[in-house]
Amino acid sequence: MSIEWIKDGQIILAVIITAEYQPDKTEFITPPDYTQQIGFIVNKKGKTIVQHLHLPVERTIVGTPEVLYIKSGKVEVSLYSNEKKLVITKILNKGDIILLIDGGHGFKM
């Protein structure tokens, strides 16, 4: 598994990006309309990314998206529907990233 989108029906609860994910080119995982962007920049040593600004985009935000990076160890994450029903439990390892988008969540270290 490199990238896994976890849904409850049509509702995206989270996206998990495992440490093994190594794109060969610059790639953004999240769609442009997301308030939180996750991207991987791939360039050769010495390459410069020119200073730039992101254009202002007016958005309506419902909820609080979170990005968690597992720096060490393992974490068991349980993802819940908006009705507080368990959808799935996953193990995240060192180097994994999870973007929590909707629904609920709990953690066990």
Describe the residue ranges of each PLM region:
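Well-ordered beta-strand positions
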Residues: V42, Y69, I91, L99, ...
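A short, N-terminal "cap"/entry segment at the start of jelly-roll beta-barrel domains
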Residues: M1-K44, V50
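Short acidic-glycine-tyrosine-enriched beta hairpin
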Residues: S81-D102
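Short beta-strand His + acidic residue motifs that chelate non-heme Fe in jelly-roll/DSBH
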Residues: Q51, V77-S78, I98-L100, G104-M109
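A short beta-loop-beta micro-motif enriched in histidine and acidic residues
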Residues: T30-Q37, Q51-Y69, K85
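Histidine- and/or cysteine-centered catalytic micro-motif in compact active-site loops
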Residues: N43-G46, L53-P56, Y80-N82
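A short, sequence-level motif marking secondary-structure junctions
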Residues: I11, T18-A19, L55-V57, N93-I97
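Glycine- and acidic-residue-biased ligand/ion/polar-headgroup-sensing regions
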Residues: K44-K45, G63-Y80
